Amino acid sequence: MVISVATRVHSQKAEQALGLAQREIDRTRVLVERGNYTVVDLPPLAPGADQDAETALGANLTAAPTDYDHADPVDVNGDGDDDFLVQRYRVIGQEDGDGIPVAFAMGVRVYDIDVSGGGNLSTDPASLVMTSSDGGRGTQPLAVLYSTIATSDQGESLCNLNTYLRPNALPDQNEPSPTSGRLPDSCN
């Protein structure tokens, strides 16, 4: 019975954490798609982020231990007590002429509020198997999501996204447009 209760509690926390992570991704996506934002409105840059890391997704974004100081406490049930710590970050992506990111990779990690680790939290998600313990909630994130965020309705959106996804491609290696078989010349 102890295993059943512990597993149920862990699953409920993981489900809440996943929903919270998805809301953070969606909130940033809507902000960028609306187009009225500055760099300050976006998730902070990941430590050590550089131009070469811009298309890294999945495990490549989690190479360094996380910094506890950059996780924000969140109260999901409105009881006045924080339930989770949310860490949002991005890597340098494609910028417009004003230096505003218009395409970038973003990650969200959601930790239980009771995490320990003193600034050295794990980046591997906690296990969701049957357990009589905390299942890794003490040091590991309950939810980890990654996504590519990009503007989609501005004049240079297609070119910016293509440059972001294939920064080292030669002009003839770029993805074709539906009408001409190539991207517009302005993208090259």
PLM regions: where:
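C-terminal juxtamembrane segment of a hydrophobic transmembrane alpha-helix
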Residues: 1-12
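Flexible, low-complexity segments enriched in proline/glycine/serine and punctuated by aromatic residues
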Residues: 10-188
